[in-house]
């Protein structure tokens, strides 16, 4: 009986499969990858390929001795916005704190004004260069949050822009509604009133339009309380939407544990997370998403509790947190380095945070690891060892990217 054909076969490379529990990086030397219908159908040693494998493939590709990793997954971005907050950067360098700037009307609210004034086309055009920078460093899936509109019309426009970016470029975009990002001017002094409006009108309408894949809340003393976050999570649960949270960045409030109680996909930032919060994440299977770009830009000193996260088996993801105020970063490779240097992750842990655990933070079980049956999303790297991705700064060693089995336009011919 004839075997089913393969669309492509990739030979002569080393594979960092990022499979858990085996060799470091899940490494396979002299590896081979076979693809059919956008899925991986063989991942292993070339010597273990079945007889006639090369004749079975419609196309053969020589990896040229390069390393191959899963496509990178940036699980936390605010990629769509208008305006700049470079002036706030200057103010922080002069001693102003993030909280002081926010309470004085800067921060998120200042971006809201510029974003509300931008058209859909303008939002897409401004985000495309940021997206292209991520793609150039091997990203095949990313999350994009709303949260810079804070009215139903402008939040809709942000989510529509995010969806459009996924059509304009060869990348999968997961959308997150972050209407509970800051208090809009129209509801000044009335946080509960805004949450009423968000839960009763904004979220149901946008979810009904198919624009929302998940729901997030900024749960901090300068943003929304535990009680307000609870109401948003309950509304999301009622609509069948998963939740996540910005929590424990500026102090210990309990937002991460609260979100874990709702089975949250992730709790993000978590610099001030305590052991009880870590235990809650572990019990719920909630991912801790570390954001070293914001930590660096805000010159924070309280590091996330990495040792406790390891001890209790909490999956650790990392992301760019690309946003105009606290992490204007479009380099996932830089985040690998920062996660190691600032948070003391190992290079392998950091890479797992941008692959396997990044996928988990988005609720995606079909990617993030090179394994048969999963999506054929992978990146080719001109490196001698996977640790070089976190080690070297400035050069981009990404040779090419394959998404759903289809090569994206490479920087160099195969």
Swiss-Prot record:
Keyword terms: Cytoplasm, Histidine metabolism, Hydrolase, Iron, Metal-binding, Zinc
Binding site for Fe(3+): 76, 78, 246, 321
Coiled coil location: none
CDD domains the UniProt entry points to: Imidazolone-5PH
Record InterPro entries: Amidohydro-rel, HutI, Metal-dep_hydrolase_composite, Metal_Hydrolase
Localization per record: Cytoplasm
GO cellular component: cytoplasm
Biological processes annotated in GO: L-histidine catabolic process to glutamate and formamide; L-histidine catabolic process to glutamate and formate
Residues the entry annotates as binding N-formimidoyl-L-glutamate: 148, 323, 325
Listed cofactors: Zn(2+); Fe(3+)
Binding site for Zn(2+): 76, 78, 246, 321
Purpose of the protein: Catalyzes the hydrolytic cleavage of the carbon-nitrogen bond in imidazolone-5-propanoate to yield N-formimidoyl-L-glutamate. It is the third step in the universal histidine degradation pathway.
Name of the featured protein: Imidazolonepropionase
